[in-house]
Amino acid sequence: NYEESMELNKLYRVRGMLDGREPLISRRPFREVHHTATRAALIGGGIVPRPGEISLAHSGILFLDELPEFKRSVLEVLRQPLEQRSIQITRTSGNYIFPADFMLVSAMNTCPCGKFPSTACTCTPAQIQAYLSKISQPFLDRIDLSVEASKVEYRDLVKESVSCPESSAVIKVRVCEARKRQKIRYQNTKIQCNAMLHGAELSKYCRLNGEEMRLMGQAYEVLNLTARSYHRILKVARTIADIDYSEEIKLEHLQEAIGYRTLDRKYWGRYV
């Protein structure tokens, strides 16, 4: 919207990145950061701090490829902005706060050679542990959706066309409708989307019935969830319900949301 566009343009102006070809940014940004990026490059820095990549991705997407290749200390600085949607940089001249409300998207292999858990993997357990331990549990808690991409079979690779249950265009319509539902639901509040729900708001808008409550209780114990990951599952389930045109969070919505957290247990639970 207009307010988001103006805020983003101010950030790019402070960074000196506006030019005559695109004097006004009207599209959501997509920022891809290389794994050699420093802490200052990511969150901002300088004697007089300037916005970093997380602020340049404000209202858009920040993409981190080869996630475990980043220094752990660099990844850890993302924990605050992922919660607060802003970053604070302190200097002797004062405190500087930059907006950083971005969607984090990342990709990674499960080991240095990229073939674990296949028998073709050449890594030792110690190498796998060292690789995965670059990503801490508190950082993982802030990841809402974890999806494992399976190996593409040769017969699928050489197919001239691959059929999909739904096209991107069809999915886009459902997502836009879900955002409209959220806009109506939160029209008299400061909340813009489900991801912004906290505290009492979760109890109000993510209410569960008996069967759903029992499932969440089981998941909390079996998956050893933290309070943060528990609340994030509720928000994801609320979004899945919206995409499914449902006012209530049903059992199948919760099951899908919980399924997006199982990679933590599958890989990090084994080696970290």
Feature-to-residue mapping (PLM):
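Residue-level recognition of specific faces of alpha-helices
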Residues: 4-7, 41, 53, 66, ...
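Basic, amphipathic alpha-helical bundle interface domains used for macromolecular binding and assembly
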Residues: 48-49, 72-271
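Post-Walker A helix-loop "phosphate-sensing" segment adjacent to the P-loop in P-loop NTPases
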Residues: 1-6, 10-18, 84-86
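Hydrophobic alpha-helical scaffolding
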Residues: 28, 32, 67-68, 133, ...
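Conserved alpha-helical scaffold flanking the Walker A/P-loop in AAA+ ATPase domains
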Residues: 23-29, 34-62, 95
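Walker B catalytic acidic pair
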Residues: 59, 65-67, 77
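Interdomain boundary/hinge elements
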Residues: 5-6, 22, 97, 189
